[in-house]
């Protein structure tokens, strides 16, 4: 049996040969005993042995004055090292806590009693001690509740703490000190959209209680700034857990090497990489002196050859930012790592430190380390830059001016997930600056698509099976970067549409997420928002040749032709003629590729089905559904023929109206903008307005305010709702009847008379137009008067 699979008992034996293993049923000749009674007796015997053993341990700990058993006590008992043949020499039952200090691992806890349900002969391993060790370094007593940015007290144990990344197993412990912190999901909140048909980005000041790593989570489509509690993925771990950032881990590694030189406990199959010994103060000064940059290290004269500095005995608290910047120019990679880690730590949330670092020329020196021969230096340099430019426009400009974009794209070619996470995070941070978006789009789109989007979406090769955690974060950062760029200028949108493979990668990823049930994923949200933004003003910005093809190659739309120009055997009111528009729409699908590529996806009939699936299946992430509705609003907007074709396709083939109305019932104001805008477009192009009126009118009237105290949606939503009702009332008497029946007149009159702001003026004018059209139904005048309304209410100012 391999050592990694050998499970030791957590109950410490009295002597070296003691064991709590029970005789087998064969040995007791109880194989054929009465089943339940035999199990009960065996469980009772186990409980008695456990209780007696715990009592002995409790007495022994009180007698010794401590619950810890040191190595000398172990040897005094004469525990034979070679008793268990499956164990290697030096492994003891106390080493399973994975701590570096053998004397502080096992802490027996006296428990009063145990029921048969809580103990058995197979439950001997008590993990309480192991949990206590790990919790001390993940939000526990070692750092308290201050988080990463707080002051780090002196850890009680002299050995290096077990980090959050080490708990995942041997594979995740390979790069213990160089792993960058996994960015957690930002939660959504409220941010007003300025446009009804374009996704916008989040303000740089957006904050979250789950933002354990400082960088811009800029987002489009009205993404918000509230805490992360309303996004379910943010609750993967305990909310109170403190996660140490890479800079803190590096500083603590150097600190740990100064405090203790003791060996760590054996870990089965751990395979930890040997960590280079932290340089002494003398080696620091000599190395920097060789390079011509001698730092001002306080207390240097107090150094002796056999002890470290007393001022540094508690860690590297005496390092300042100027010294850390000078370390970046050292020839020793250890010094460069230390300097970058300190800058990363200081610039986490300190605006003054970011400004000071820029004045000390930290930005150009970090850029030179992006493609260093030592990968650990690369990781810490990019991690430091990621914090340095967060919410700091001047540092972003300095990075771009130092040819940082070119160096970042070179680094992106490295096959190291930690580096790629940092690089894509830096690009996302840069994209939050409006004046950098056009340049970023020009310099990065093609390489980012080839190196990240296509491989990780499955569009550029074999089908995507599943992304690992690092790949998921890399793709998330990349789509967040695109989400910001897509909300920029028309030229940037056009460049993104024409970028080979970009739209294909996004559509492929969304389809895959829907197939595997991950439509709530934040990367899906980013991808849908990008498609929404790229669909903005699509028919005005698309290639003329494609637009001509969508308009029917010069063929007249029979639905809009005057009756006198119709040639054929059918009268204008015949059933055959009414069916012609549907046939014409079906024929136009032959003019669109059945296998769309690139920007063809944006107006393809297949994309309507994709958005409809998102509306039906995405229940939790409201930003995804808002973006899907906004994208449909974009491609059905305007007077273009193809907008009408896609509107009728959504209504008649995709049956999208019921999912939309379900969303309207529970939608917030941001969602209502997109949903009501889409329904407005559909109501213009619907063939059967009577059927649509029966489904829509009652739901929309519920959203209208009828008095001063009632909750009122934004003016833009009110205008959309009134426009939908107007489109239906003009063509359908059923809509006028339902509007009267569901008390819509009272609400419309209230909106018409409310003119206390510029926004309410817009909704008042819309209500006046609708009331005037209602008065045209003379058969309803008696019903109007019966409810107390006069002609002046409909036609008056």
UniProtKB/Swiss-Prot annotation:
One Pfam family of this chain: Arm
Keyword RNA-binding among UniProt keywords: yes
Keyword vocabulary terms for this entry: Cell adhesion, Cell junction, Cell membrane, Cytoplasm, Membrane, Methylation, Nucleus, Phosphoprotein, Repeat, RNA-binding
Main location: nucleus
InterPro entries in alphabetical order: ARM-like, ARM-type_fold, Armadillo, Plakophilin/d_Catenin
Gene3D superfamilies (UniProt xref): Leucine-rich Repeat Variant (1.25.10.10)
Site entry (Interacts with SFN), positions: 285
Molecular function as annotated in GO: alpha-catenin binding; cell adhesion molecule binding; enzyme binding; RNA binding
UniProt PTM: Phosphorylated at Ser-285 when localized to the cytoplasm, PKP3 at desmosome cell junctions is not phosphorylated. Phosphorylation at Try-195 by SRC is induced by reactive oxygen species and potentially acts as a release mechanism from desmosome cell-cell junctions.
Biological process, per Gene Ontology: actin cytoskeleton organization; desmosome assembly; desmosome organization; epithelial cell-cell adhesion; epithelial structure maintenance; negative regulation of mRNA catabolic process; positive regulation of cell adhesion; positive regulation of cell cycle G1/S phase transition
Gene Ontology cellular component list: adherens junction; cell-cell junction; cornified envelope; cytoplasm; desmosome; nucleoplasm; nucleus; spot adherens junction
In-chain residues carrying the UniProt-annotated modification Phosphoserine: 123, 180, 183, 240, 285, 313-314, 331
Positions of ARM repeats: 305-348, 351-390, 393-432, 449-487, 491-536, 596-637, 645-684, 689-730
Organism domain of life: Eukaryota
Transmembrane segments: none
Assembly notes: Found in a complex composed of CDH1, RAP1A and PKP3; PKP3 acts as a scaffold protein within the complex, the complex is required for CDH1 localization to mature desmosome cell junctions. Interacts with FXR1; the interaction facilitates the binding of PKP3 to PKP2 mRNA. Interacts (via ARM repeats) with GSK3B; the interaction may be involved in PKP3 protein degradation. Interacts with hyperphosphorylated and hypophosphorylated RB1; the interaction inhibits RB1 interaction with and repression of the transcription factor E2F1, potentially via sequestering RB1 to the cytoplasm.
Described function: A component of desmosome cell-cell junctions which are required for positive regulation of cellular adhesion. Required for the localization of DSG2, DSP and PKP2 to mature desmosome junctions. May also play a role in the maintenance of DSG3 protein abundance in keratinocytes. Required for the formation of DSP-containing desmosome precursors in the cytoplasm during desmosome assembly. Also regulates the accumulation of CDH1 to mature desmosome junctions, via cAMP-dependent signaling and its interaction with activated RAP1A.
Protein name: Plakophilin-3
Organism in which the protein naturally occurs: Mus musculus
Gene name in the database record: Pkp3
């Amino acid at each position: 049996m391999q050592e990694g699979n050998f499970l030791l008992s957590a109950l410490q034996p009295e002597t070296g040969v003691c064991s709590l293993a029970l005789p087998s049923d064969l040995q007791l000749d109880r194989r054929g005993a009465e089943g339940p009674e035999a199990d009960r007796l065996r469980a009772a015997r186990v409980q008695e042995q456990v209780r007696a053993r715990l009592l002995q341990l409790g007495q022994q700990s009180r007698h010794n004055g401590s619950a810890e058993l040191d190595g000398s006590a172990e040897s005094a008992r004469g525990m034979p090292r070679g008793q268990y043949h499956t164990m290697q020499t030096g492994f003891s039952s106390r080493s399973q806590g994975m701590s570096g200090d053998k004397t502080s691992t096992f802490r027996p806890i006296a428990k009063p009693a145990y029921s048969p349900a809580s103990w058995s002969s197979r439950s001997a391993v008590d993990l309480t001690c192991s949990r206590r060790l790990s919790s001390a370094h993940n939000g526990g007593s070692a750092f308290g509740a201050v988080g990463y940015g707080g002051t780090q007290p002196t850890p009680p144990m002299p050995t290096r703490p077990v980090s959050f990344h080490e708990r995942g197993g041997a594979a995740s412990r390979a790069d213990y000190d160089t792993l960058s912190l996994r960015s957690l999901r930002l939660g959504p909140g409220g941010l007003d959209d300025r446009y009804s048909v374009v996704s916008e980005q989040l303000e740089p000041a957006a904050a979250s209680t789950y933002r354990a790593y400082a960088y811009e989570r800029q987002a489009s489509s009205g993404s918000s700034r509230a805490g992360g509690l309303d996004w379910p993925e943010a609750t993967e771990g305990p909310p109170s857990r403190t996660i140490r950032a890479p800079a803190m881990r590096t500083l603590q590694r150097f600190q740990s090497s100064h405090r203790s030189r003791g060996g760590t406990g054996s870990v089965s199959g751990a395979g930890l990489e040997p960590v280079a010994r932290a340089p002494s103060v003398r080696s620091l000064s000599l190395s920097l002196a060789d390079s011509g940059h001698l730092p001002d290290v306080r207390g240097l004269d107090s150094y002796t050859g056999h002890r470290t500095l007393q001022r540094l005995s508690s860690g590297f608290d005496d390092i300042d930012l100027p010294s850390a910047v000078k370390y970046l120019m050292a020839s020793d990679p250890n010094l460069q790592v230390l300097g970058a880690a300190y800058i990363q730590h200081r610039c986490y949330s300190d605006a003054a430190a970011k400004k000071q670092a820029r004045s000390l020329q930290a930005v150009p020196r970090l850029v030179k380390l992006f493609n260093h021969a030592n990968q650990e230096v690369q990781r810490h340099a990019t991690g430091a830059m990621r914090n340095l430019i967060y919410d700091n426009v001047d540092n972003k400009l300095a990075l771009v001016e130092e040819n940082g974009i070119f160096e970042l794209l070179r680094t992106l070619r490295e096959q190291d997930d930690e580096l790629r996470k940092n690089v894509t995070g830096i690009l996302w941070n840069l994209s939050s600056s409006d004046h950098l978006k056009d340049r970023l789009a020009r310099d990065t789109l093609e390489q980012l698509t080839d190196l990240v989007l296509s491989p990780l979406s499955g569009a550029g090769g074999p089908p995507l099976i599943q992304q690992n955690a690092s790949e998921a974060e890399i793709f998330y950062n990349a789509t967040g970067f695109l989400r910001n760029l897509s909300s920029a200028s028309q030229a940037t949108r056009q460049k993104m549409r024409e970028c080979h493979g970009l739209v294909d990668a996004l559509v492929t990823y969304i389809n895959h997420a829907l197939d595997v049930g991950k439509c709530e994923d934040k990367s899906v949200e980013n991808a849908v928002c990008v498609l929404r933004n790229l669909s903005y003003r699509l028919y005005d910005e698309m290639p003329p040749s494609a637009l001509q093809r969508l308009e029917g190659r010069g063929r007249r739309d029979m639905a809009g032709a005057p009756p006198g120009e119709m040639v054929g055997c059918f009268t204008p009111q015949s059933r055959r003629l009414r069916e012609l528009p549907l046939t014409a729409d079906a024929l136009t699908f032959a003019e669109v590729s059945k296998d769309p590529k690139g920007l063809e996806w944006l107006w393809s009939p297949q994309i309507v089905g994709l958005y409809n699936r998102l509306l039906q299946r995405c229940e939790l992430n409201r930003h995804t559904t808002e973006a899907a509705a906004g994208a449909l609003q974009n491609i059905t907007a305007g007077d273009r023929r193809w907008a009408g074709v896609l509107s009728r396709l959504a209504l008649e083939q995709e049956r999208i109206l019921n999912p939309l109305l379900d969303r309207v019932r529970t939608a917030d104001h941001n969602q209502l903008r997109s949903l009501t805008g889409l329904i407005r477009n559909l109501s213009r192009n619907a063939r059967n307005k009577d059927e649509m009126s029966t489904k829509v009118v009652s739901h929309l009237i519920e959203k209208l305010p009828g008095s001063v105290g009632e909750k009122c949606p934004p003016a833009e939503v009110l205008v959309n709702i009134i426009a939908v009702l107007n489109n239906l009332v003009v063509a359908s008497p059923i809509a006028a009847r339902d509007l009267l029946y569901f008390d819509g007149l009272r609400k419309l009159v209230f909106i018409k008379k409310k003119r206390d702001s510029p926004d309410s003026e817009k909704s008042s004018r819309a209500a006046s137009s609708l009331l005037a059209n209602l008065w045209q139904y003379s058969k309803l005048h008696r019903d109007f008067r019966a409810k107390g309304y006069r002609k002046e209410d409909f036609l008056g100012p």
